[in-house]
Amino acid sequence: MALTKAEMAEHLFEKLGMNKRDAKDLVEAFFEEVREALESGEQVKLSGFGNFDLRQKSERPGRNPKTGEDIPIKARRVVTFRPGQKLKSRVENTKPTE
């Protein structure tokens, strides 16, 4: 099971008493800020949660799995996430639910 943006908005509505539209707008605005920062090359640091970083991957050789043909994999930027110590500790000390 995964937590969706709609579920986040619903939790804000329930926990903070926000109206549903404002909660949805808040979630969308938060993710838009993160997206814009990453697109412009900035690191995103969320205290107590973790960091979103950009990493440059250089071009490298690859292979088409169907044909076995050698193909180059283009250089690109990728987003990485490194959880903060507080998040790591909380996740490590929580029993998984099924």
Swiss-Prot record:
Recorded name of the encoding gene: ihfA
Protein name (database record): Integration host factor subunit alpha
GO biological process, one term: positive regulation of metabolic process
Pfam families: Bac_DNA_binding
Taxonomic path: Bacteria, Pseudomonadati, Pseudomonadota, Gammaproteobacteria, Alteromonadales
Organism expressing this protein natively: Pseudoalteromonas atlantica (strain T6c / ATCC BAA-1087)
NCBIfam families: himA, PRK00285.1
Family annotation (PROSITE patterns): HISTONE_LIKE (PS00045)
Gene Ontology cellular component annotations, sorted alphabetically: cytosol
Bias type Basic and acidic residues, positions: 54-73
Entry-linked HAMAP family: IHF_alpha
Keywords: DNA recombination, DNA-binding, Transcription, Transcription regulation, Translation regulation
Segments of this protein annotated with the region Disordered: 52-73
Sequence similarity: Belongs to the bacterial histone-like protein family.
InterPro entries per UniProt: Hist_DNA-bd (IPR000119), Histone-like_DNA-bd_CS (IPR020816), IHF-like_DNA-bd_dom_sf (IPR010992), IHF_alpha (IPR005684)
A GO MF label: DNA binding
